[in-house]
Amino acid sequence: FPYTTLFRSDKIEDVMLRLYYNNIQSIRPDSLELVSIVVKSCDMVKLMLKEFASFRHSKSLRDHIIAINTLEEQADQVFVTSMRELHTTCTDPVEIICWREVYFYLEKCTDACEHVADVVEQIVMKNS
């Protein structure tokens, strides 16, 4: 394994660490939309992986892959909107820096889910 794989924490842990060490005491409402997309993406990955065991006979595996990709696109849009909201409404530079990190890592969670879906799709295509 390359060095980065061995020492990289998972994406959700990255979000939690930012909340912890930046001592974030209250949650911005716009972050909840990103969190909701992350949860849906993780749930969809779980469903996809259950179907993956029988991918040759699965009727829903492809739908799960498409749903994960769609959720990642939604997260990209919410990320841009949230960052814009943060930078136009917040006047505290420290708060801006802290929340930029949180938003960034929340979006990376959906990127990671999409990566899993991409790998599953590649495996299915190679073995079909």
Describe every region a protein language model picked out.
Residues 27-57:
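Long, non-coiled-coil amphipathic alpha-helical linker/lever segments
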